[in-house]
């Protein structure tokens, strides 16, 4: 039986040696509303910016974020960008950076200009030298890599074709790892898979796979056939082809392919998703899992990564919710116990760029009218918070005979619904304090209210949010249901 907790415990004992092209990823977010008078070029009104460790460094960050240790070997230039990356990697408790400085080249830096509203990339500017490292730098890289192999449980080569993974570095690293019985995973960039000869697993995306195999790779059967030929040439044990929204196909050498569909998710940014896949594959395989388990974990991690803005990492809690989607339906996870806990959830969602919705009510006896409102509310946002009147609040509003069910029971019923992400119980007569704290992007109520009657509408409108009124279902209300029950009517 699969145990996610046991897997996490095993992951925490693993050390991954990651070698590859380090870079700095910068994201400048803004909007374009006019053309420059100086040239036919859009003017970006910058609203904010983010800086992240990218490339193979993002692989290392994902390895560490999921709970394993990472020894990272990469190349930097003698510049401010390189020194910044060295400092940032050094501050990560689970990453041990071993960086080689090459004063003849700049540290790779990529700046992306992104539409804040649409999450679309408008422009990218690169600072880089992509030529292979010189012979003396190659030797320094190998001097950094080879002594670390004995400490590693698995080796991961992250090739961005920026000069670190030369043919010699690849060859000597794989040969030395094999002598020590270490498995090697390669996220390839070269169209010549033969240079990765002897690796355990190659993880190309569909475009890279098509270029390397000169096959159409239009169907899973075509991918499987071409992969067998490529594996014979590269002498590797398996090939995993990532296919974006079409999922992944893993082909073991001489075995039956395994196909995993992509998990449904709102894609915000695909930057670094391949890094996440490679990192999770490495740590899960190192932990002793089989191909299928590692592949499904990687697919779940990719779904989390692409739902975030920028170059992102995946945490164990996020992976748990994707691998075990029903685990997050437990009442103790969805029912908020304090303002501080609510703030922490909101902080995480906003960091991921998610649209937060809010609705509220007594929900004393759940009926189809409630379900319609909750379903419509969830459809208008990424995460839905339900404000629930406490028992004392219900008594003040509905009379001493209410509620029929106490607040904990009502909260647990709401928490069991797929449409509901959080339940927050409030003591006041109205949810105004909650709405002020949450500042939702969308506020939802039943259509028996007007927009002006919805508590908190002015707060939401002031922040540029929306107020959604959902048509009520005639004949369904808790008050009428209670009255009919007391009269013995059905």
Curated annotation (Swiss-Prot):
UniProt keyword list: ATP-binding, Carbohydrate metabolism, Kinase, Multifunctional enzyme, Nucleotide-binding, Nucleotidyltransferase, Transferase
Q: Where is this region: Ribokinase?
A: 1-330
Look up keyword Cell cycle and say if it applies.
Answer: no
Q: Could you tell me which residues belong to the region Cytidylyltransferase?
A: 358-490
What are the positions of the active site?
275
Reaction(s) catalysed (UniProt annotation)? D-glycero-beta-D-manno-heptose 7-phosphate + ATP = D-glycero-beta-D-manno-heptose 1,7-bisphosphate + ADP + H(+); D-glycero-beta-D-manno-heptose 1-phosphate + ATP + H(+) = ADP-D-glycero-beta-D-manno-heptose + diphosphate
Pathway listed: Nucleotide-sugar biosynthesis; ADP-L-glycero-beta-D-manno-heptose biosynthesis; ADP-L-glycero-beta-D-manno-heptose from D-glycero-beta-D-manno-heptose 7-phosphate: step 1/4; Nucleotide-sugar biosynthesis; ADP-L-glycero-beta-D-manno-heptose biosynthesis; ADP-L-glycero-beta-D-manno-heptose from D-glycero-beta-D-manno-heptose 7-phosphate: step 3/4
Superkingdom of origin organism: Bacteria
Q: What class of enzyme is it?
A: transferase
Q: Where does ATP bind?
A: 205-208
Give the EC number(s) under which this enzyme is classified.
2.7.1.167, 2.7.7.70
| GO CC entries | cytosol
Please list the GO biological process terms of this entry.
Answer: ADP-L-glycero-beta-D-manno-heptose biosynthetic process
User: HAMAP family per the record?
Assistant: HldE
Q: Could you describe the subunit structure of this protein?
A: Homodimer.
Q: What does this protein do?
A: Catalyzes the ADP transfer from ATP to D-glycero-beta-D-manno-heptose 1-phosphate, yielding ADP-D-glycero-beta-D-manno-heptose.
Q: Which NCBIfam families match?
A: cyt_tran_rel (TIGR00125), rfaE_dom_I (TIGR02198), rfaE_dom_II (TIGR02199)
Q: Which family does it belong to?
A: In the N-terminal section; belongs to the carbohydrate kinase PfkB family.
PANTHER family, sorted: BIFUNCTIONAL PROTEIN HLDE
Q: What is this protein called?
A: Bifunctional protein HldE
Q: Which gene encodes it?
A: hldE
